[in-house]
Amino acid sequence: MKLNSDIKILGKNIILVPYRNYHVPKYHEWMKSEELQKLTASEPLSLEQEYEMQKSWREDEDKCTFIILDKNKYGQCGDEIESMIGDTNIFIDKESSTGEIEIMIADQQARGKKQGWESVILMLLYGIKHIKLKTYEAKISLENVISIKMFEKLDFKEKSRSEVFGEVTLEKEVSDEWLQWLEILTYLLR
């Protein structure tokens, strides 16, 4: 998405940066993991296909993605590649003003440190304020209990469940109260 092509979002513990072609090799290495493929319902891609996917994320107006950097690590080394820990995405349906949000903390050492929590909150706020989303959905593998619980803590409710596909769809309608609550959460993270 060109809207976020020059945006850098600073959090307390993370930085969200646009997905650029120089991020692709590390991202490609992550996606070779069978665990990540299973948790994200992804198929392995060749490196060339991954570059095409990155280009699509950059150019398509119905997709928004950021690479998640560990802010402390980036502060020490100044290297985005070395600091990468995951990504967060929104698939946008402009007609209904709905965004399907995704989060992946690929770096196992970064898991359990609330960096995914902080990333999702910042991405939700970005979608509300800049893309003007009115509703969010999260489609999550039934095996990814941690992610399901995180979205439930963000007040997402179950919309549907597919045993065939092994996933649950959670939904949250944006309200002024929820927006204020998200802003308070970001303030408390600082």
Predicted regions and their residues:
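A short gly/proline-enriched turn/hairpin at secondary-structure junctions
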Residues: 36-44
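A general structural signal for well-ordered secondary-structure junctions
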Residues: 36-37, 63, 157
